[in-house]
Amino acid sequence: MKLSSKPLIYTPDWLVSFEKDIAAEVLLSLDPGEVIREYRMRYDMSQEDMGELMNLRRESISRIENGTVTPTFDFVKVFIKAVALIEAVRVERAQHKGMDVYFLENIAKEFGFSREKLPFMLKLGVESYDKKLNKIQKSLKEKEYGK
């Protein structure tokens, strides 16, 4: 992943704010590994998924999350972009019946991700959104029927 200082054309302002919020959480935390773990779990990713996303082994992700290894600044930058892109996928999924893959592809490009990573990131975003939606629907049904 390459980072550039070019102006963002496709990335919406809300997503830039989302990135800043994640950055603040990770960088200002006394336990950045725990924050990283919480985001990974929020998006329903395994350590293997996160490793594939970050081009690291699962064991490296585990060491970062457990605080044995401090995440590098480069790791944190890529992590923030990855989580933001997955959030963009989820929002796109929630707002539209069909997803604008071209839009998401352009955000991924602005974030410095290769085109080859996009299908995996789309899969992670869609699966985590669908699981969350199913959980909410199940909870509503249980409340409706008094279970």
Residue ranges and their predicted role:
Residues 132-147:
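Short acidic DE-rich linear segments
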Residues 68-81:
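Short, basic-rich loop-to-helix N-cap that marks the start of a DNA-contacting helix
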Residues 37-38, 48:
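Residues within the helices of the helix-turn-helix
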Residues 44-62:
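Short alpha-helical DNA-recognition segment
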Residues 57, 68, 83-86:
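The DNA-recognition helices of helix-turn-helix-type DNA-binding domains
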Residues 1-30, 78-127, 144-147:
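N-terminal flexible/basic segments that precede or flank functional cores
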Residues 34, 44-45, 71:
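Residue-level signal for the short linker/turn that defines the boundary of a DNA-recognition helix
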